[in-house]
């Protein structure tokens, strides 16, 4: 009962964290609900970029691929390689999920550095990358948790839960807490890195507005891509782990 209570408290804490506000926010009132408009607007922009890129990629495929087609094929192969390395031979059905996570996070992170969100004025707050908001990163982490529970249950059925008493039943509380803390580590790692990167750039621009921030911005682009890769790789690793049934 203590383990179950602790797990429920962890989930409740994660839900509360998803409501944390950093700075001012702009909301839409829809019925009896307040909708976080800043995150929705920037997320829609990112989704539009991804859908537009996908349309360009599949619009007119050539037998002899063009440079653009080569680029998109390379991205697909890269995502497939990451999925296969972490999940194993049954990686196929999970490539779309891992690819969606990677591309959404990658474009979101880069949008914070490349798109001039700040020039768009809002009644309250300001626009920023979707992954600059804890609500987005918690949602992505919870989706990952649902995915690896589904992967384990779909392959092993209720026998999936036997992993919690391996290699010894003494580790039951630790194994349960491990699964419930994975979303916390995923969400806070991504949120903290993106928020810190944008804050550093803003501070440097305010102090030395011309030359100094440029190298930091390039470093931010690099770390943003690395964070997207880390998130997608860990998500694939968790899914592969749940299907294999060992740690």
Swiss-Prot record:
Write the record's keywords in alphabetical order, separated by commas. ATP synthesis, CF(0), Chloroplast, Hydrogen ion transport, Ion transport, Membrane, Plastid, Thylakoid, Transmembrane, Transmembrane helix, Transport
GO (cellular component) term, any one: proton-transporting ATP synthase complex
Q: Which InterPro entries match?
A: ATP_syn_F0_a_bact/chloroplast, ATP_synth_F0_asu, ATP_synth_F0_asu_AS, F0_ATP_A_sf
In Pfam terms, one family for this protein is ATP-synt_A
As for membrane topology, the entry says: Multi-pass membrane protein
The answer to whether UniProt assigns keyword Transit peptide to this entry is no
Which superkingdom? Answer: Eukaryota
Q: Which Gene3D superfamilies match?
A: ATP synthase, F0 complex, subunit A
What GO molecular-function term can you cite, just one? proton-transporting ATP synthase activity, rotational mechanism
Localization, UniProt = Plastid, Chloroplast thylakoid membrane
**TM regions (residue ranges):** 38-58, 95-115, 134-154, 199-219, 220-240
Q: What is its main location?
A: plastid
Asked if GTP-binding is a keyword of the record, the answer is: no
Q: Which HAMAP family match?
A: ATP_synth_a_bact
Instruction: Report the family membership.
Output: Belongs to the ATPase A chain family.
Q: Which NCBIfam families match?
A: ATP_synt_6_or_A (TIGR01131)
Q: What does this protein do?
A: Key component of the proton channel; it plays a direct role in the translocation of protons across the membrane.
Q: How does it assemble?
A: F-type ATPases have 2 components, CF(1) - the catalytic core - and CF(0) - the membrane proton channel. CF(1) has five subunits: alpha(3), beta(3), gamma(1), delta(1), epsilon(1). CF(0) has four main subunits: a, b, b' and c.
Protein name per UniProt:
ATP synthase subunit a, chloroplastic
Q: Which organism is it from?
A: Citrus sinensis (Sweet orange)
């Amino acid at each position: 009962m203590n383990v179950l209570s602790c797990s429920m408290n962890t989930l409740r804490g994660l839900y509360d964290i998803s409501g944390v506000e950093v700075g001012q926010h702009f909301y839409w009132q829809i019925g009896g609900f307040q909708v976080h408009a800043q995150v929705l607007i920037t997320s829609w922009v990112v989704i539009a970029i991804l859908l537009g890129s996908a349309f360009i990629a599949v619009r007119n495929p050539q037998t002899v691929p063009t440079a653009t087609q080569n680029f998109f094929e390379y991205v697909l192969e890269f995502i497939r390689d990451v999925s296969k390395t972490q999940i194993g031979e049954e990686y196929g059905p999970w490539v779309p999920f891992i690819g969606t996570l990677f591309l959404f996070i990658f474009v979101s992170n880069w949008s914070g550095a490349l798109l001039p969100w700040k020039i768009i004025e809002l009644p309250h707050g300001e626009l920023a990358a979707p992954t600059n908001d804890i609500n987005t990163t918690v949602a992505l982490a919870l989706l990952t948790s649902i995915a690896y529970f589904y992967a384990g249950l779909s392959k092993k059925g209720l026998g999936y839960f036997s992993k919690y008493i391996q290699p010894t039943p003494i580790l039951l509380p630790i194994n349960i807490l491990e699964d419930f803390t994975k979303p916390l580590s995923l969400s806070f790692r991504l949120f903290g890195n993106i928020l810190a990167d944008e804050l550093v750039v803003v501070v440097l621009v305010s102090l030395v507005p011309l030359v100094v921030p440029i190298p930091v911005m390039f470093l931010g682009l690099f770390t943003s891509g690395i964070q997207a890769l880390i998130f997608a790789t860990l998500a694939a690793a968790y899914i592969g782990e749940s299907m294999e049934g060992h740690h």
